[in-house]
């Protein structure tokens, strides 16, 4: 089963320049709670990510998860850890759309655009912050 997890601002923004758009003191506590939620949802499961998300993690997999990295035409980093599986998007969808195993899409936006229609569960957080 494919699922997706993301947090967003009320304007729909989920990222900015390969980073999260909520930074600074006013977002500190809610961002901490949302990262805790992210960890609780994804830990012990498989996750799937695109190139920019993997790059934002400095090409290091998330701990305590099997990491699927979607192959595109971009150059791939060499010597990836054993818990990173390289797979193309069509093979990924075929393998997991009807699987009992939950694989959580963690971004980025292009991968969400492709996988949301296959996601049986969507974990969405919206950050409402008073200015």
Residue ranges and their predicted role:
Residues 1-101, 111-124, 129:
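N-terminal nucleotide/polyanion-binding subdomain common to many enzyme families
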């Amino acid at each position: 089963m494919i699922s997706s997890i993301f947090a967003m601002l009320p304007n729909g923004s989920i990222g900015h320049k390969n980073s999260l758009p909520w930074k600074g003191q006013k977002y500190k506590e809610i961002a901490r709670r949302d990262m805790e939620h992210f960890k609780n949802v994804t830990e012990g499961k498989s996750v799937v990510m695109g190139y920019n998300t993997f790059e934002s993690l400095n090409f290091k997999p998330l701990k305590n998860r099997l990491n699927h990295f979607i192959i595109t035409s971009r150059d791939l980093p060499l010597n990836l850890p054993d818990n990173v599986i390289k797979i193309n998007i069509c093979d990924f969808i075929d393998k997991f759309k009807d699987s009992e195993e939950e694989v959580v899409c963690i971004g980025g936006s292009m991968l969400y655009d492709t996988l949301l229609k296959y996601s049986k569960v969507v974990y969405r957080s919206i950050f409402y912050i008073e200015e």
